[in-house]
Design a protein with these regions (language model features):
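Short, structured coil segments at secondary-structure junctions
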Residues: 202, 220-223
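Hydrophobic anchor at the start of a short beta-strand
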Residues: 44, 205-206
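Glycine/serine-rich phosphate-binding loop and adjoining beta1-alpha1 elements at the start
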Residues: 81-174
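Glycine-rich adenosine-cofactor-binding loop
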Residues: 143, 159-164, 168-200, 208-211
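A glycine-rich (often HGG/GG-containing) alpha/beta subdomain
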Residues: 1-107
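Short acidic low-complexity segments
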Residues: 222-234
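Short, charged/polar "capping" segments at the starts of alpha-helices
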Residues: 63, 193, 213-219
Length: 234
């Protein structure tokens, strides 16, 4: 048994390149089922965020496929075009990377808080789809536990640590007040809700975009307005 990892992130690729390899929750579930069906694959987890896409695979001795080639085939793209943006890790290197990553030490904003939830959600999805295995279960749970310890014991991780908090602190440092200002948040996912709540705390007038086909059921943070995504420029 062993662990392989392959990934693309903000440190090596711009957002337009990273977006080529991004997964929705549904896409990730379908991809994991196909990957797990490959010979030698015991389990797999897909971690896909705005800053990275990473695949973690628990493998048996008969494993022989290239994770990178498999990913490119699934995305319907030429492998050679993007190979330089990817990093591959195996066994100890893959484990160490996940521990550092979960602790926020490889984030654009050092020690940001969202990554722990994203790692937990990635494992939860793999578990729901019966695509993980005992090795990956233990690895991801240990990484989350270690990350929580870092958050509680390391000084630089105390306080709010997200991209939006950093942006707000930067604006306030320049003497700019958000009170009464019109702010639009594109999207109502986890990061969108975090952004909307942070802006509301600064007494901004916040509007959140939602997709029209979801507008009848989606919930937005209290005190925020909503607008269909297609009408955002009007």
């Amino acid at each position: 048994m062993g662990i392989f990892m392959i990934g693309i992130d903000h440190s090596r690729a711009a957002v337009d390149i990273r977006s080529v390899f991004a997964f929705t929750k549904k896409n990730a579930a379908e991809f994991m089922h196909r990957l797990k069906a490959e010979k030698g694959v015991a389990g797999c987890v897909v971690l896909s965020t705005c800053n990275r896409t990473e695949l973690y695979v628990s493998i048996r001795e008969e494993y022989s496929i290239s994770l990178y080639d498999f990913l490119c085939r699934e995305k319907g793209i030429s492998g050679e075009k993007f190979r330089e943006y990817f990093t591959e890790r195996k066994d100890t290197a893959a484990v160490e990377h996940l521990f550092y990553l979960s602790s926020g030490l490889k984030s654009q904003i050092l020690a940001e808080d969202q990554i722990i939830t994203q790692v937990k959600d990635a494992l939860a999805l793999a578990r729901e789809e019966y695509c993980t295995d005992g090795l990956l279960e233990v690895l991801f749970r240990m990484a989350v536990t270690a990350a929580k310890r870092v958050k509680s014991e390391v000084t630089f991780s105390r306080g709010n640590s997200s991209v939006i908090d950093y942006a707000i602190r930067f604006l306030e440092g320049q003497g700019f007040s958000l009170e009464g200002k019109n702010c639009m948040v594109i999207g109502n996912g986890e990061m969108g809700r975090v952004a909307a709540l942070a802006l509301k705390e600064k007494n901004a007038d916040v509007t959140v975009t939602v997709r029209q086909y979801k507008s009848g059921v989606v919930k937005i943070p209290e005190g925020c307005k909503r607008i269909n995504y297609g009408e955002r420029a009007e």
